Structures are given as C-alpha cells and as structure tokens.
Design a protein with these regions (language model features):
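Short acidic, glycine/serine/threonine-rich loops at helix termini
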Residues: 86, 109, 129-133, 151-154, ...
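Short, solvent-exposed polar/charged micro-motifs at secondary-structure junctions
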Residues: 60-66, 83-87, 212-214, 298-300, ...
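Active-site beta-loop-alpha junctions enriched in small/polar residues
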Residues: 76-82, 99-102, 122-124, 143-147, ...
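Structural preference for beta-strand elements that scaffold enzyme active sites
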Residues: 72-74, 95, 116-118, 139, ...
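A charged N-terminal "starter" segment
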Residues: 1-153, 157-158, 195, 199, ...
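Conserved active-site and cofactor/substrate-binding residues in soluble primary-metabolism enzymes
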Residues: 52-55, 59, 80, 84, ...
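Active-site loop/helix belt of alpha/beta enzymes
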Residues: 2-3, 168-311, 407-409
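Charged (often Lys/Glu-rich) extended helix/loop segments that serve as interaction or gating elements
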Residues: 270, 276, 280-428
Length: 428
C-alpha cells in the first residue's frame, strides 16, 4: 500500500514573458466541483494552512456510491489521515483500509467496528500482525506463503485476501512489483491459508494510483476471473473481491502542465460490468469492496501558501530561468509535485504581465520542485514575497507525506470546513 515514486532533477529551460488577462497560468479546474466554500476559506486564511472541505468530500462519497451501489467503501487512510476527515467518512458509512497498527488504532477512534477495517498492507511483521489481531481486526491482505504462515501463527482463524499483481499500465504510479503475486502464486497462497486454518476470504487487486485508463480495470477483472475459476476446481469458494484503489482525481495536471482527463464514466461502467462477470464465475455470491483514497479527498483539499520569492537567474549554459519559490513544497504538502502539477491561483494578480517559471518549494533539496519538462507555470511578473498563492486539488497525501521539520519547516496546520461546522487542527 506504499506508492513507488521516482525523483526527478530540474534541468534548465528557457522562459519568456508575455501579457495575459488570465487569472492563472494554467487551465481551469473541472466544472464538476463546487469550489465556492473552499475558495472562501482560502480567501479568509491569513496564514499558510491546508483546508479540507468536508461537504465536498461527502458529495464525492455519495457520487461514488451512486456509481457503484452495494460496494463497501474502505477509505485508504494513507491518502488523508486527518481525524476530522476520517470521522466524517465513518459517519457516512465508510470503513477503512489500514496499513499499520497505528492506522488501525486511528480508525477505531472514529467509532467504526473492527469488521469495517482491514489490514490492507501485504508487508507486515509478526508484531504488526499480532497487534492488529489484538485490536480486533480479522481481515488481512497477503501475497506470499511466508506472510500466510505468520498470519496463521499470530492471527489464528483470520480471513485473508490474496492480492493479485497487476501491470500498473496507465497509472501515474504503477505499484506493480512491490505488492501482489502472480495468479499462479495466488492459488498456492490460498491453498496454504486453508491448510493453516485461515479462511480464504477473497482476492484483491490495485490497478495503480491515479489510474488513467478504463482498460486497466478490465484487465484486472480478467485476471481475477481466471483465479476464481481455478479456485472453484480446488474447492475454495471466496466471499469477497476487493477492487482496491486507483480511481483518479480530476483537478490535477500532468508533469507537463496538461489537464488530466481520465474517462471516469467509462471506468465505472467497466467496473460494474466486471463485477457482474465475477459473480457469474464464482461458485457463491460475492461481496465487493473498494479502497478509494485520492478520488475522495484530492479535489476537496487546498493549500493557502505564500510567495517566498520570484527570482531570475542565468544558468551555466547561458539560459535565464525564472523560479517561483513557495512557502510549501514536496516536504510540507506537495509531495507528488515531481510527477504532477497542482493548479495554482494568484488571487492578488487577476491580470497583467506573466513569466513562465519553474515552481519550487522552500527547502534545500533540489527535488523540491515541479518537474519542468515543457511544464513551466505562468506566474505574475509583479508578484512579491509574502503574497498569497492558492494551490488546488492537493487534499490527497498533503498531510500523510509531510516531514517533521526538514530544514526547520514545520508541517502546515489544517482547517476543516463544512460537515458539522468545521474545525481547526494543529500541524498536519
């Protein structure tokens, strides 16, 4: 359940200046989202902070349930381990996909019962398994014979899901090697689970984080169907299929600054058809689970940051570059900035002259920057240190990946709006 990322260093690029009346230097956000409340909160903020719109998250949850009725949601906690967000999702009926005993404990504090929490991490020590079992969790993901043996010893009688590997094709983060096993190994794993006194409960997949194609879901379904058919011959009848995460956010840009436009309607159609296909294959009725993370929270979180400096420097190759340094970056809110771009808004500069700049965070790490290949951002030339910058669609992983004081920069505080009246939190 830990995402693989690749760091990128920032090569030199030419920049040009031109006049524009655009409010920002990038394409507008999808019209599907009502950003009225979150924009008002950004405007009201007088210091840097992350803002979560609980009402927006609730609308997103309702839309997901409407597209996939009957599917049990297990929110991927790693995407947004903020107590108020978790409490709100629990009240809506969500359970939780936890990756550690610490996440399990946090999930339990929302008031959900342990049967709405599964230990979705295939990587866990004997101690982790025993702790989760003591906390009441009985559903464990697995992908190896060694892990099955450990679960049998430290969580006797537990239910196991075997994670079947996918290629990760079409996703920004593929998750294809560290997690999951081949369909052939899945048969061995579930055979071993049964022999060890565990309940072979289900199969799971993950098509990759920020999946951009519907075909990935279709391929995953075919792989699951093949395993189910083989299990029928072995006399193993499963109860549940966990379709994992991967549903995308809509408000971010690719690393070149182009809007990402995943075919969400087609994805849902393929998933619905896939569930029917798997029901016809399995020897008994199937329940389905889903582990959305960024899909629920990314587009309903934003950061109020400020400008550290807009500077112009000549590089060793003779090119001149403009750099916009922000008060937050990869290590305190924008961890994924090397693989995608967040939409920036400059509320104090609705027009005027713009320059194309590399956007970077405040730390002394050169990875703390947008990957600038053909993806320079239009920035108001007149913007000054201290002026606000609004960063949209960064509600996923903003708090989870933040460091604790790298270079002395502390995690951002957060505010939750909507829900039962909103609340202010401490550092993320």
């Amino acid at each position: 359940m830990i995402r693989q990322t690749t760091a990128h260093r920032a090569p030199a690029h030419h920049t040009t200046a031109h006049h524009s009346t655009a409010h920002t230097g990038i394409a507008p956000a999808p019209a599907a989202y009502d950003r009225t409340a979150i924009r008002a909160a950004l405007a009201a903020a007088t210091d840097d902070r992350i803002i979560y719109d609980l009402d927006g998250i609730e609308r997103q949850y309702a839309a997901l349930i409407g597209e996939l009725p009957g599917v049990a949601v297990r929110f991927a906690m790693k995407a947004c381990p903020v107590d108020e967000v978790l409490d709100h999702l629990a009240a809506l009926g969500s359970g939780f996909d936890a990756a550690s005993p610490q996440e399990i404990d946090q999930a339990l504090r929302t008031g959900v019962s342990p049967d709405r929490i599964h230990y979705g991490n295939t990587i866990k020590s004997d101690r982790n398994i025993a702790q989760a079992y003591r906390l009441g969790v009985r559903d464990f993901a697995t992908d190896s014979l060694e892990d099955v043996a450990a679960i049998a010893e430290h969580a006797p009688g537990a239910r196991v899901f075997c994670r079947v590997a996918t290629t990760g094709d079409g996703a920004l983060w593929g998750l294809s090697r560290k997690f999951g096993c081949s369909p052939e190994d899945a048969l061995r794993v579930l055979d071993a689970a049964r022999a060890a006194g565990l309940t072979p409960s289900g199969l799971s997949v993950h098509v990759g984080s920020q999946q951009m194609t519907a075909e990935a879901w279709g391929a995953a379904v075919e792989s699951l169907a093949a395993v189910l058919e083989a299990l029928n011959w072995r006399g193993i009848t499963l109860e549940r299929i966990n379709l994992g995460g991967g549903l995308p956010a809509l408000g971010v840009l690719d690393r070149h600054g182009r809007p990402l436009d995943p075919p969400l309607d087609k994805m849902f159609a393929v998933i619905r058809d896939g569930m029917e296909r798997l029901r016809t294959v399995n020897a008994a009725p199937l329940e389905f689970l889903l582990e959305p993370g960024r899909h629920l929270v990314a587009d309903h979180g934003a950061i109020r940051a400020h400008v550290a400096r807009l500077s112009s420097r000549r590089q060793l190759d003779g090119t001149r570059e403009d750099w916009l340094y922000l008060s937050c970056g990869k290590f305190n809110g924008l961890y994924e900035m090397d693989e995608l771009q967040y939409r920036l808004e400059f509320p104090t500069h609705p027009g005027g002259q713009f320059v194309n700049a590399v956007v970077a965070g405040p730390t002394c790490d050169s990875d703390d920057a947008y990957a600038p290949e053909d993806g320079l951002v239009r920035v108001p030339r007149a913007i000054a240190s201290g002026e606000p910058v609004w960063i949209h669609s960064c509600g996923a992983y903003a708090t989870a990946y933040t460091t604790r004081g790298f270079n002395g920069f502390e995690p951002l505080p957060y505010t939750c709006i909507g829900g039962t009246g909103g609340s202010d939190g401490g550092a993320a």
